């Protein structure tokens, strides 16, 4: 990571993505976690399998605020190549209860 993420659950999620560790990814989430991509709610499991784990996915954080609760990253997978993305996380009891992601504007 080139930017500092200090929230342990967010660190764990990023590490899981970069290691291709599906179990660790879901362990960083609450059981009822939800997500949206480009403003549309998605089935989290289906989305993660398609976007992060079938590819394989990589995530390089470029900038982060609020301990990583809001960040800009370069995401890479075999389907879409490299995209500049935003991520916003909501935490509950030390885990991620929701994240919103989508394409970010140019740097």
Question: Residue spans of the language-model regions?
Answer:
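Short hydrophobic/aromatic-rich beta-strand segments that constitute the beta-sheet cores
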Residues: 35, 71-73, 98-99
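A short gly/proline-enriched turn/hairpin at secondary-structure junctions
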Residues: 28-42, 50-51
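Hydrophobic pocket/interface hotspot
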Residues: 13, 24-26, 33, 44, ...
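Surface-exposed, charged secondary-structure patches
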Residues: 44-92
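Short, low-complexity N-terminal intrinsically disordered segments enriched in polar/charged residues
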Residues: 1-19, 24-27, 31
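Hydrophobic/anchoring residues in structured secondary elements
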Residues: 35, 64-66, 101
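Short beta-strand segments enriched in hydrophobic/aromatic residues
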Residues: 29, 75-77, 103
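Short beta-strand edge/turn micro-motifs at domain boundaries
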Residues: 84-107
